[in-house]
Amino acid sequence: MASELPMSPHLEQIHGEIRDHFRALANGFQRLDKIKDSSRQSKQLEELAEKMRDCKRLVKEFDRELKDGEARNSPQVNKQLNDEKQSMIKELNSYVALRKTYLNTLGNKKVELFDTGAGVSGEPTAEENVQMASTMSNQELVDAGMKRMDETDQAIERSKQVVHQTLEVGTQTASNLKGQTDQMGRVVNDLDTIQFSLKKASQLVKEIGRQVATDKCIMAFLFLIVCGVIAIIIVKIVNPNNKDIRDIPGLAPPAQSRKLLYFRE
């Protein structure tokens, strides 16, 4: 059994993690058979693909540790460990092929929903994939599985780059919008200040207008008084014997004409 192989503690830890991933993959594919909704099946397949990528990373790490410890192990132990590595790679590739089969089956179901019967799809069916996998050698399965995983990793990296670029554009747009929002806030504050200044100026103009109107009324009243006094003076001068008009205080009455008296001898 694999657990009885002589391994270093770190190599044994990696081996245990790989086996845990294999059990999780087996359980995941069992649950996948019970799922009827295509969208949920797609989501489950994505989760299984993520576990396969982790498993592939662990297998590579297992291979590196194995190569680093070859000098410390006997040829027989190295052969057993290499056989275990090939067994894990083959098991991983079987899950990769199984996922591909489910993807093709799911794709065929979607095509059947929209197919008009005019043509035939060129994609291999699930049965063809199983037959193809059964005719391939272990090394061919390993190479095909690694190639498929590399293609998946490249697609994920491209998706990550697109997401990163989208985030950069979104961040730049948000920064520009924030700057424009701050500028609009300053403009609104300036408009409020101008409006307040205009209100104060309007109130000041009204106050000055009221003061000017009051001064004009006073000047007009004084002008009427002066005109009245002048009119009375003129009347007194023209008709000094008019008793209907009282004497103006401070104004001396007009001098009476003097008559010269002379005596006859």
From Swiss-Prot:
Gene3D superfamilies: 1.20.5.110
t-SNARE coiled-coil homology domain location: 146-208
Taxonomy, superkingdom: Eukaryota
PROSITE patterns (alphabetical): T_SNARE
Function: Vesicle trafficking protein that functions in the secretory pathway.
The family this protein is said to belong to: Belongs to the novel plant SNARE family.
The protein's name: Novel plant SNARE 12
Organism, as annotated: Arabidopsis thaliana (Mouse-ear cress)
Gene: NPSN12
